Each structure stands twice: as C-alpha cells, then as structure tokens.
Amino acid sequence: MRDRCMLSFTKEQLTSVGEYCTLHSSPLPKSVEEQCRVTDERSQDEVVMAPSPAQCAWLMSFALASRPRRILELGTFTGVSTLAFYEGTRKTKAEIITVDMSEEYLQIAETAFRRHGATDRIQTIRGPCLEILPTITGEFDLIYIDAAEEEYEAYTRFVLDHKLLSAEGVMLVDDGTYIRWFYFFQANWWSVLLEGLVVDRSIVKEFPEEIQEPYLGIADQMNDFNRYARSDPRVEVTMIPLFNGVTQITWK
C-alpha cells in the first residue's frame, strides 16, 4: 500500500519474521553464520549490537551489487558485518578497514578473521573513530557507520569534508552504540529511527521510567543528525525503514 512505508509487526513477531527471511534467502557463508553464533553466545545486552543474519545477508548483497574497491567500517563489534562485506566482495577483492575502540571486541573479531582466512583483505584499527579518521587516507566506495550515535554527525562531516567517500561511493549509516537497557526489548531497534521515538515522543512511556528522560535526549540527538544529513547541500540522502533504519548518503 502506498501509505505504508514498512510492515508492522509486534516485538514478539519480529524474531520469527527475521528467521523466515533468512530461511528464504540464499544461505549465509560459513564464516558469517559461525560468527553470528559466536555473537549470540554473548550476553543479551551485547548481542543486540550485532546485525541480524537477515541484515548480514543484505549487507553481503549490497556489497556484491555495488562492487566497492575499498570499504571503511566504523564500529566492528565481533566482526559479523565485516565478514559479510568480506564475503560479498570475494570477486572484487575489496580492501576493508574496520575501526573499533574496544580491545575485547576487536580480539573476538580478529580471531574470527584469522579462523576464516580473511586477514588478507581486512585491516583492524583500535581507537575512537574520531581520533582514527584523520589518520585514514584515500577514498572509499562503501562506508558503513555503526558506532557511537552521538558522533554520527561528526563522522559524516569528516567523511564529506575530507572526501573519504569516492565520487560514486555510498555511505550507509546504521544503528548506534550500546545502551545497557537494550535487554528490555527483543528487537534491535537502536537506530536512526529509534523505534519511532524520533517522530512520536509519547512512545517513551513504554520504556522503564528511569530511562525515559535519557532516551528523549537520545531521540533529540538522532533527530539532529537526521536533519543535518538531509540539509547538507553536497549530498543526496535517503532514509530507509529497513532493519533498524538505514540512511543512505551519496554525493550529488
């Protein structure tokens, strides 16, 4: 229907729908499937930081279709999305640089990269993304942002100001950083849409009382980023109600 931009499911239905989509998509490569399982063994409040198997399949297909030569990922976590990009660029042999400030998570990711023979094209860098970005040179055809949400605008401004995004490149801005209250919700919804809180502040009443005010602040931050991205005259911006909400940015 034209007036519906996304399907509506209850939180209880989301897991089943995700599993159905994965079942009816091409099988995930062994490396991605195995790292999804490794990630699922983490505590529930950590697991929600990782892309779902269905999202990994989409990231792979996006990389396969766009054929990037170089990929920059801000936010590695356990390396699930990194491996999805690796598998999606086997034909093009894309160079992948992934950045994360957590030594613990990078060790988990690097172990997986070695186990699956992916170190030939993946370079990991540890440190805060805003400190690492100035040290990165060259252009990237695909930039994937999945790190600290309060820094989304700063990441995007730096990428554009320093032309890290190639002329025909695509920047995908996905969900943000970990908040300990995630485990209250079955779906991974921390995103540029913030489960609708960016457009309907009354939704906050569904949250535990002690986090309502902080989450309204988070919604304000996400709205600030969304408005900034839309108003930057240098780029074309499309916000897609896909998974947790994905903003796609390209040069005009």
Curated annotation (Swiss-Prot):
Binding-site list for S-adenosyl-L-methionine? E73, G75, T76, S81, D100
Keyword Metal-binding among record annotations: yes
Q: Name one GO biological process term.
A: methylation
Uses in biotechnology: Hancockiamide D displays potent cytotoxic activity against murine myeloma NS-1 cells, suggesting a potential antitumour application. More interestingly, hancockiamide C, the likely end metabolite of the hkm pathway, shows potent Arabidopsis thaliana seed anti-germination activity, but is inactive against the monocot Eragrostis tef seed, suggesting that it could be a herbicidal lead targeting monocots. The herbicidal activity of hancockiamide C could be due to its phenylpropanoid-like structural features, which may act on the plant lignan pathways, and hence warrants further investigations.
* UniProt keyword Transferase, yes or no: yes
What Enzyme Commission number(s) appear in the record?
2.1.1.-
Q: Which CDD domains match?
A: AdoMet_MTases
Write one Gene Ontology MF term. metal ion binding
The residue stretches assigned to a coiled coil in this entry are none
Keyword field: Metal-binding, Methyltransferase, S-adenosyl-L-methionine, Transferase
Q: Which domain of life is it from?
A: Eukaryota
Pathway field: Secondary metabolite biosynthesis
Signal sequence residues: none
- Per UniProt, the enzyme's principal EC class comes to transferase
The record's family statement is: Belongs to the class I-like SAM-binding methyltransferase superfamily. Cation-dependent O-methyltransferase family.
What is the recorded function of this protein according to its Swiss-Prot or TrEMBL entry?
O-methyltransferase; part of the gene cluster that mediates the biosynthesis of hancockiamides, an unusual new family of N-cinnamoylated piperazines. The NRPS hkm10 and the NmrA-like reductase hkm9 are proposed to convert two molecules of L-Phe to the intermediary piperazine called xenocockiamide A. Xenocockiamide A is then converted to hancockiamide D via a series of hydroxylations and O-methylations.
What name does the UniProt record give this protein?
A: O-methyltransferase hkm8
